[in-house]
């Protein structure tokens, strides 16, 4: 064995490549070993250093891959054992054990986290060269007994199922120990680079290689100063020194110092020496030179997004200077926090990148499909799960529009559960859903699912066969092929599909002869899919590499950006969580000399020093270290390592907000520039110098020219909401000439509430989602129907009997039976409505001097000028003197207000009066009024009553009165009824004014509607708050920003309010 160490200013890779070349020139086969996370980059670096740029004699690989070169032909043809397969084996193991068999872990048998911890422990035991019987000295002896039972039974299952329990390194070591590879290894040289420690498994293999290979060469970075130190605790080279010292002591060899031809910039060397002096308690009498600072930058940004954008702009600048993407490395302090944001921002700046981390499969449509399938079975056909299966695009041959229609209907009819999905859809609504088509679609969905879900407990092999048959029926494989829209997606889908088939194969192999329920089968497959990961190789090598900062090696790239280096992430504090505590691992390690657990928390300090040292020397030309003040929406402090750099004299640059400028880094990329122009267009105006204004004027002129070529336009500012008028063609279709414009009192109210709301409801015909569950609209229909029946009953039966009959027959109508007998909640609503009917009905019994002459009367009121107003009058009453009036039932409190009417927000009663005047018989000229009847169950506060007497009854009936517009002429006839006439009496001339102004409101609205230009103008009564429908989700209206667009209502003081509004009405309607 040969041990080599060198200073950070030299290239260890070059030194080891030279050693490898010498061995290769002598005819030896050389394996150049790198850590798993660095083998790809190390291979490119090694091949670059070879003069011939490639050779068959030197193989750059990993320990595991190296073992396959020697054992691929002699290895037994056993099943491969991966993490998912291990989890299934442990699940089967726990199925065969009873809770009483496991005193410590019996309650965790079905816990997925516990199974994951068992998998991790089993892998750790293999890496540590330990067996479960070596787990002595645990806190509770019962733990070892339980673990022995579980793992021994699991290993028995592995043997029965012909799984290979040995790792590749164990198989390699066994072959060497048996002397099967002596001839090959005698002609082999092993070169090891990038390690600062070995696992027990690697350590054992290394001892065998040292005895059988021609030579083993190991290199590591250690300064000569550190190597000569006797006390190394806290030294930045502590990990490497322990590594070399342990090897030197074990193999009785002295490490040698070597140098490379390549010497890196002295600025990095001087920074390393300052860093070393800080931690070995020595002193230096010099500081960083001014030109050294050109190679380092310390950035501070407000949050992650700004930080990534500054990095992206800097990368674009490097490209402008002539460098390549492959010259740049981006390191992340927190991979999870940055992974979702860095991709879209780099795409915006058109920076190709490769994220050096396996992607989880959890977000793939196939995984979502499997999860929805499992949940559908477990939760009895829940609607959300069925729809998620369809939306994955992998179930059957349904268009998106068909799925949307199916979803709309199932939400309307509240279809959920197997019972409702299995029955034909019969309920319809005013929208007239295509029930025949929906039922055909329902059958295509239900039949294959029903066939699968009815599977009883049976052998796992049979369940897999039925699952595969189901997947064939729904054309899963064909649909999977149709998902991909790019070559990258094709590669991802192939990886996911391969993983899926591997999981099915493992399940069939392990549980084929075990009896399982379908729910357990689907849950196991789902768990395996959700925990699986895949990795896609970049299509080109010229990309920016992105990875976690703790995987970096010295001298990786010319330019390195390390971001997210906050106190919480730099240094990283690793704490192990599993079935064994660190204290238990330490006690086991004390007993076993060469077989040991890795205890991450015990090595945090020296590992973090080693990582910081590698990071500070990761670049060969320029190193940028950045820290956000807010990460994951949490404030964080500077890393202690960065504070040391500041003490060395490196300035901390506050990058601030990502303002646009006319620097090359801001304007060199068209896509990024366009996105930032849009961002500026949405912001408040900022102060600009004359030079800035001139520059951006020219840039905008150029951009608009380019956008016009692509038929694009810049969006308008959010703070100036405007709408475009409809085209002439659309106006002719929506409002054809010669056909009257149809309006109603409700439509007019919507128009004056917010014109854009009228456009949505009555031009685009957009409606809210319907539901079979009773709402205020259906409640109103029910109440109307009961009172209609009651008022039509002219028999001599007592009033209470009539009321009971009206309620009974209304409840028997098929529509109301479907609505109110569907569930307990609906039945409760019906009970409340019946109480309201019983409470309101007495008012009809009291008014014996009126006669109901018509109910639910449809009308069409010709307003002239091609306007037709339509509606339904709930009830037409006639007083004893022959005068007519209308009643409108309301489920909420309503009262006529002349100011609200003047502003167009309450035209209903006056419109009905106009309609009644038109349809009334010719011999009847007098109208006594139009009124609301609030259908309610009056609530009284008994605390306000001193005693229960007639005043209580009077208060109840006082709440049950007609409120609205009444004729002053009919005052005497109204005084004996339940009419609230105070401040509600109008003379005939005043009533005529109301009718004429009502016509004016319709004509004014119709004229505006026919122009086809609808404003976003919800009304405001005080100019401070907006009461109209703002439609924020559609219009993005904000009261504090867009108050100027709101329609201000005309308000007058209460004194002489009626007379003033009538005067205004006469003026505006030209009376």
Swiss-Prot record:
The keyword Disulfide bond does not apply. Its cofactor is Mg(2+). GO terms for molecular function: 5'-3' exonuclease activity; ATP binding; double-stranded DNA binding; helicase activity; hydrolase activity, acting on acid anhydrides. It holds the Pfam family PDDEXK_1. Its EC number is 3.1.-.-. Disulfide bonds: none annotated. Keywords: ATP-binding, DNA damage, DNA repair, DNA-binding, Exonuclease, Helicase, Hydrolase, Nuclease, Nucleotide-binding. It comes from the Bacteria. One of its GO terms (biological process) is double-strand break repair via homologous recombination. HAMAP family: AddB_type2 (MF_01453). The heterodimer acts as both an ATP-dependent DNA helicase and an ATP-dependent, dual-direction single-stranded exonuclease. Recognizes the chi site generating a DNA molecule suitable for the initiation of homologous recombination. This subunit has 5' -> 3' nuclease activity but not helicase activity. Belongs to the helicase family. AddB/RexB type 2 subfamily. Despite having helicase-like domains, this subunit does not have helicase activity. Heterodimer of AddA and RexB. This is ATP-dependent helicase/deoxyribonuclease subunit B.
């Amino acid at each position: 064995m040969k041990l080599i160490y060198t200073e950070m200013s030299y290239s260890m890779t070059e030194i080891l490549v030279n050693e490898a070349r010498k061995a290769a020139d002598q005819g030896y086969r050389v394996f150049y070993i790198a850590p798993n996370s660095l083998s790809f980059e190390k291979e490119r670096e090694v091949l670059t250093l070879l003069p011939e740029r490639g050779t068959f004699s030197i193989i750059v690989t990993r320990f595991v891959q190296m073992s396959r070169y020697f054992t691929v032909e002699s290895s037994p043809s056993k099943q491969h054992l991966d993490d998912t397969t291990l989890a299934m084996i442990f699940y089967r193991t726990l199925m065969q054990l009873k809770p009483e068999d496991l005193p410590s872990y019996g309650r965790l048998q079905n816990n997925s986290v516990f199974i994951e911890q068992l998998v991790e422990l089993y892998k750790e035991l293999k890496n540590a060269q330990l067996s479960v019987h070596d787990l002595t000295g645990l806190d509770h002896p019962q733990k070892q007994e339980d673990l022995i039972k579980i793992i021994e039974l699991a290993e028995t299952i592995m043997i029965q199922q012909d799984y290979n329990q040995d790792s590749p390194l164990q198989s390699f070591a066994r072959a060497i120990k048996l002397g099967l590879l002596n001839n090959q290894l005698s002609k082999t040289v092993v070169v090891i680079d990038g390690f600062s420690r070995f696992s027990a498994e690697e350590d054992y293999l290394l001892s065998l290689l040292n005895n059988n290979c021609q030579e083993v060469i190991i290199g590591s970075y250690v300064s000569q100063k550190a190597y000569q130190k006797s006390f190394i605790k806290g030294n930045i080279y502590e990990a490497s020194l322990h590594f070399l010292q342990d090897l030197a002591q074990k193999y009785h060899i002295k490490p040698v110092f070597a140098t490379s031809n390549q010497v890196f910039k002295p600025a990095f060397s001087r920074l390393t020496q300052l860093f070393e002096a800080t931690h070995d308690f020595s002193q230096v009498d010099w500081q960083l030179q001014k030109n050294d600072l050109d190679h380092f930058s310390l950035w501070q940004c407000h949050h992650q997004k700004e930080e990534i954008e500054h990095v992206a702009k800097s990368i674009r600048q490097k490209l402008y200077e002539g460098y390549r993407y492959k010259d740049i490395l981006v390191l992340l302090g927190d991979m999870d926090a940055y992974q979702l944001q860095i991709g879209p921002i780099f795409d915006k700046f058109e920076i190709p990148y490769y994220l050096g981390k396996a992607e989880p499969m959890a977000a793939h449509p196939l995984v979502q499909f499997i999860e929805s399938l499992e949940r559908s079975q477990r939760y009895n056909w829940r609607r959300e799960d069925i729809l998620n299966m369809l939306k994955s695009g992998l179930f059957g041959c349904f268009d998106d529009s068909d799925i949307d229609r199916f979803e709309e209907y199932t939400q309307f009819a509240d279809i959920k559960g197997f019972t409702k999905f299995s029955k034909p859809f019969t309920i319809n609504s005013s929208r007239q859903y295509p029930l025949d088509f929906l039922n055909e679609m329902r059958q295509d969905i239900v039949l294959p699912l029903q066939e699968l879900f009815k599977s009883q407990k049976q052998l796992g092999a049979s369940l897999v066969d039925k699952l595969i048959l189901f997947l064939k029926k729904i054309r899963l494989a064909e649909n999977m092929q149709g998902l991909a829209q790019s070559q990258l997606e094709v590669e991802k889908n192939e990886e996911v599909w391969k993983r899926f088939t591997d999981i099915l194969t493992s399940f069939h192999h392990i549980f084929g002869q075990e009896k399982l329920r379908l729910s357990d089968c689907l849950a196991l497959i789902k768990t395996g899919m959700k925990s699986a990961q895949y990795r896609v190789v970049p299509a080109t090598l010229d990309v920016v590499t992105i990875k976690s900062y703790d995987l970096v090696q010295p001298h990786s790239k010319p330019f390195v950006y390390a971001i997210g280096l906050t106190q919480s992430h730099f240094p990283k504090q690793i704490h192990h969580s599993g079935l064994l505590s660190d204290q238990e691992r330490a006690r086991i390690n004390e007993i076993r000399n060469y077989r040991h657990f890795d205890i991450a928390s015990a090595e945090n300090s020296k590992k973090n020093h080693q990582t910081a040292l590698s990071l500070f020397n990761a670049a060969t030309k320029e190193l940028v270290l950045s820290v956000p003040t807010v990460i994951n929406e949490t404030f964080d402090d500077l890393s202690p390592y960065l504070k040391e750099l500041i003490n060395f004299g490196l300035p901390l640059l506050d990058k601030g907000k990502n303002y646009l400028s006319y620097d090359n880094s801001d304007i060199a990329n068209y896509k990024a520039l366009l996105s930032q122009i849009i961002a500026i267009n949405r912001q408040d105006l900022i102060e600009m110098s004359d030079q800035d204004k001139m520059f951006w004027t020219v840039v905008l002129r150029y951009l608009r020219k380019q956008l016009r070529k692509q038929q694009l336009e810049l969006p308008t500012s959010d703070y100036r909401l405007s709408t475009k008028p409809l085209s002439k063609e659309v106006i002719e279709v929506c409002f054809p000439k010669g056909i009257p414009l149809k309006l109603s009192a409700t439509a007019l109210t919507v128009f004056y509430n917010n014109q854009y709301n009228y456009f949505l409801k009555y031009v685009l015909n957009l409606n809210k989602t319907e539901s079979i569950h009773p709402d205020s609209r259906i409640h109103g229909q029910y109440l109307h129907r009961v009172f209609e029946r009651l008022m039509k009953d002219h028999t001599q039966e007592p009033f209470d009997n009539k009321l009971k009959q009206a309620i009974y027959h209304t409840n028997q109508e098929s529509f109301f039976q479907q609505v109110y007998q569907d569930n307990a909640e609906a039945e409760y609503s019906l009970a409340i409505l019946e109480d309201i009917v019983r409470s309101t009905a007495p008012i009809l019994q009291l008014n014996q001097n009126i006669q109901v002459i018509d109910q639910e009367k449809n009308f069409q009121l010709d307003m002239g000028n091609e306007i037709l107003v339509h509606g339904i009058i709930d009830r037409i009453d006639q007083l004893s003197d022959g005068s007519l009036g209308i009643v409108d039932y309301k489920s909420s409190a309503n009262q006529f207000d002349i100011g609200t009417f003047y502003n167009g927000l309450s035209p209903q009663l006056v419109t009905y009066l106009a309609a009644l005047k038109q349809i009334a018989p010719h011999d009847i000229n007098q109208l006594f009024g139009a009124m609301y009847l609030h259908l309610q169950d009056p609530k009284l506060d008994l605390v306000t009553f001193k005693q229960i007497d007639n005043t209580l009854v009077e208060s109840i009936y006082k709440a049950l009165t007609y409120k609205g517009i009444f004729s002053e002429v009919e005052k005497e006839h109204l005084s004996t009824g339940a009419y609230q006439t105070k401040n509600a009496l109008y003379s005939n001339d005043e009533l005529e004014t109301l009718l004429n102004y009502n016509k004016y409101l319709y004509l004014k609205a119709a004229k505006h509607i026919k122009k086809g230009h609808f404003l976003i103008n919800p009304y405001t009564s005080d100019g401070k708050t907006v009461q109209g429908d703002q439609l924020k989700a559609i219009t993005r209206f904000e009261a504090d920003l867009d108050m100027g667009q709101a329609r201000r209502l005309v308000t007058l003081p209460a004194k002489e309010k009626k007379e003033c509004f009538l005067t205004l009405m006469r003026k505006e309607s030209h009376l």
